[in-house]
Every structure is written in structure tokens, then in C-alpha cells.
Amino acid sequence: MKFISQMVHNFAKKYAADTMQKSLYNSLRIDITQENIAKIPNPDKKYMLYMHVPFCHTFCPYCSFHKYAYERGACKAYFSALRTEMQRTKDAGYDFETLYVGGGTTLIDEEELARTLELAKSLFSIKEVSCESDPNHIEPESLLRFRGLIDRLSVGVQSFDDDILRKASRYDKFGSGEILREKVSRAVGILPILSLDLIFNFPFQTREILLRDIEAAKAVNPEQITLYPLMKSPLMRDQIARSLGVSNVDNEEEFYSIICKEFSSWHRSNAWAFAREKSNINDEYVGTN
């Protein structure tokens, strides 16, 4: 009976995943047209601006986000194009109260990012800015220049476990779990909110490893901790299997239950994010606008 129940459970999860993938394909499909169509902003609607910085020095084996190898000239040209696009968006009548900057490595060129954020704040009615970062771009002297520009910085630590860091090609790039703890500890308190991001359900991750990661994350005292399940997209599935291995057991549901229990006294911002204090900063940065 338990075997049949597990089969039904697995089938339901696969059906849900397939249905979601088809829905996304239909929603995001872009048809080529020769018509000059301008989308007019709805004055009764609040819009969020998303800015993507697609450059990285090296790539993580599980990451399926749009990215390119960093080249200084291309990066500066890209930021210049971003600023031009923002001006055109302003001229089209759009306004934004929130801005989310994702990547890639968003702070890969601090001067260009600061200049772009300053322009965004001058063009639009932006009240809050959230930005992602990796552990190599959170030195206090770097973050100080972003006071007044970034309200929440999400730092992708992913794990403090050295074995996971090695298999995920992050140990040599960002340092050991101990070094990561030191880096994040120095960064806490510089900007209004620092969110420490972890990944759970690695193929070889155990319950004990997850609990140690949670304990280490809480110990550095960030304002928010976010825990995402490992996203095994079809695009990256083979790469994940080669670098991280393959598990015949899916612990995502069990691990998520552990996470909810461990953060039961924290404020839940969304399904994955937990804050020490309740915040008004928007955590839902992907929508159908």
C-alpha cells in the first residue's frame, strides 16, 4: 500500500510539473510580428521594474539563468543600453515603485550598477530596490557606496557545507563554509536588509547537513533567510547529474517541512523567505504585468 501511495504521489508531482511547464510555454511564447505595437501603461496598475545583469566570471553547474562570461567592454555597453531602455520606458509613460536587480552577478561592475540605480531613482517613483549578489561582492567598503541605493541585498551562499560547495564548484570560487560565514557576518548591518540565500535538496544532502546549514545561517544574524529547492530544469539536468550526482530519493517535501519548523518563530515573507522582523519590502518580483 505504501508503494502504491508513493507511486501516486510521484505521478501527481510529475503531472503538476508538466502542466506548469506547458502553461509557462503558452504564456511566454513570443510571436514575431511586423506591426508597430506599443503597450500602453495602465494607470490603475502598479508595476515592478526588473533589471537583469547577465554576466558572471564563472558559471555554477546548476544555474539555468540567462548569463554570459564577463567581458569588461560588453558589460559596460550592456549597462549603457539598460539606461537607454529605462529612459525610453519613462518616455512611454511607465512608472515603478519597486526595482529588482537579478543576474548573473549584479555587482560585477559596481560603478555601472550604482550609476544605473541612480538613474532609475531619478526617472521613476522607486521606493525600494532589491538586488542579488554573490559572496565575492559583499565587502563592506563595496556595499557602503550602495547605501541609499539598495534596500535589500540577497546573498547567494547556497550552502555552508564544504562537500556541497566543492561539488557545486563554489569552494574554490567563494571559499569554505567558514570563510562564507565570515564574509556574510561582515556584510550584515550595512544595508537595511541582508537576505542570506540557501539551496536545499541537493542529491547527496542529508537532514543533518540541512540543519547545520540553517544553524550556520541563523548564526550570522541576517535580517532574512531564503531557502530555495534545487531547480532541476530540463536545460541543466544533465549538468547537475554530472557535477552533483543523481539521487533516487526526492527529499524536497521532507526538507521543506523541516525548514518550516525551524523558522516557525520567524515572519514568512513568501513560500521560501523568512524574516526576523516583518518588512514591507515586496518579495514577489515575478508577475504577469
Which role does the model predict for each range below?
Residues M51-K67:
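Local cysteine-cluster metal-coordination motifs and their immediate loop/turn environment
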Residues D91-F96, S265-R268:
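Surface-exposed helix-capping loop/turn segments at secondary-structure junctions
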Residues M1-L49, T58:
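Flexible, acidic/Gly-rich N-terminal and inter-domain linker regions that tether
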Residues K67-K90, E97-I259:
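Conserved non-cysteine loop/helix-boundary elements of the Radical SAM core domain that shape
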Residues L49-M51, V155:
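Short beta-strand motif preference
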Residues L244-N289:
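A C-terminal junction/extension of Radical SAM enzymes
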